[in-house]
Regions:
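Hydrophobic/basic alpha-helical segments
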Residues: 1-136
Length: 136
């Protein structure tokens, strides 16, 4: 499914920039500053997590996420880590928002997790994902 969406995005990029069909698409996506579909999905999931943690998402999404609580003194609560529920199924269970979203959130650096303005979060997240996608 993602490869089909990526093909559509590539075609749209070629139409917008009037690029030939057999030219490499990566420079075109970089020029347009478009994230590949896989990274765009990560962006949207992490943005939804940010909104949920800051009270800007629907209640049913906010209820899927909870901060990690640790009884040991070594775990610091100021890390803003989310609890990752265990899933029984590796293929579909790990793809559920309630499992995948906390994993992605916990992979972010503390700098990202502590941003208080949504505009800053979106800007820094897109820049970070863009660098990862294109090794820039």
């Amino acid at each position: 499914m993602i490869s089909s969406l990526q093909s559509v995005q590539n075609t749209a990029a070629r139409i917008v920039t009037v690029t030939k069909k057999f030219d490499h698409i990566t420079p075109v996506l970089i020029q347009l500053h478009w994230l590949p579909v896989h990274f765009r999905i990560l962006f949207e999931v992490l943005l939804l997590v940010y909104k949920a943690l800051n009270g800007m998402a629907p209640l049913y999404i906010m209820e899927l996420l909870s901060y990690c609580t640790c009884s040991r003194s070594l775990c610091s609560t100021d890390q803003k880590l989310l609890a990752v529920p265990k899933s029984r199924l590796k293929t579909y269970g790990d793809r559920a928002f309630s499992v995948a979203a906390p994993k992605l959130w916990n992979e972010l650096t503390l700098d990202f997790r502590c941003l208080d303005k949504i505009g800053l979060f979106k800007k820094h997240l897109k820049t970070n994902l863009f660098k990862k996608a294109f090794n820039v």
